[in-house]
Amino acid sequence: MNIVLFEQEEVVHGCAVLSFRDSRFCHIKRVLKLSAGACFKAGIINGVKGSARISLATEKYLVAVFEKLEYEDCALFPLHLVIGFPRPIQLRRILRDVSSLGISSIHLVGTELGERSYLDSGLAHMEKMHTYLIRGLEQAGGTKLPLITVSESVRTFCSQHTHILGDSTHQKLILDTKNTLTDLGSAALRGDVLWIAIGSERGWTESERLLFSAMGFRAVDMGRRTLRTETAACAACAVVLANAHAWKRKIPRPGKRSSPISRKNP
């Protein structure tokens, strides 16, 4: 945990109270070993970040006073993932890890070859998924949560996002092992926004491939090795962000002109 995050409603008049049952209390007291008067990195989810000072600390609770707070000076990367709904243990890892990478959104879709019971699992509820997204932010030291949606099928997802996916300035790629013309690392990336679709354990069916193709998705691969969904998701994000030189520059906050998430041609 590299930043302690709070929901906006937890902060009243610049102060927040944590009880001994709260994992954040345990981290501050037992891991950081801080006491009254000490400061720690803190932030408000989807809001400001900076530091907080412990004004009072007992064995039962502590009071933190926020100070030196400012808005993050960069936005999330304009990268969006569409993922075939994976097993719960995989989903936890994906939500945590891609959230820490700073992507804009995660869209979970039921697939024809996927296990339908995954969609009915407790982890499919937004509150549960929210928890793992926050863990990724705590690791990365950020405050901005990616958007997350759940769709029953690829067809449903496409119909719900036609107005977005139909935008010609959005580049769309689907990771696949069939009908690919190039690999992800060699794909010429262009445009301000990039979508990447990644299948669940058993991949995509032909009808799902046709749906994505109709929405303008191009098939690419990541070599001959068969990867787990969580591995493919993190690797794909890393390849795209590295090729876009995303880690060498700041993404402007909303309202400012954004640079394309594209690879610079020699």
UniProtKB/Swiss-Prot annotation:
EC number: 2.1.1.193
Membrane-crossing segments per the record: none
Entry keyword set: Cytoplasm, Methyltransferase, rRNA processing, S-adenosyl-L-methionine, Transferase
Protein's cellular compartments: Cytoplasm
Main subcellular location: cytoplasm
GO cellular component, one term: cytoplasm
Catalytic activity reported: uridine(1498) in 16S rRNA + S-adenosyl-L-methionine = N(3)-methyluridine(1498) in 16S rRNA + S-adenosyl-L-homocysteine + H(+)
SUPFAM superfamilies cross-referenced by the UniProt entry: alpha/beta knot
Cross-referenced InterPro entries: Alpha/beta_knot_MTases, RsmE, RsmE_MTase_dom, RsmE_PUA-like, tRNA_m1G_MTases_N
GO molecular function: rRNA (uridine-N3-)-methyltransferase activity
BP GO terms, sorted: rRNA base methylation
Function: Specifically methylates the N3 position of the uracil ring of uridine 1498 (m3U1498) in 16S rRNA. Acts on the fully assembled 30S ribosomal subunit.
Assigned protein family: Belongs to the RNA methyltransferase RsmE family.
Name of the protein: Ribosomal RNA small subunit methyltransferase E
Organism, as annotated: Treponema pallidum (strain Nichols)
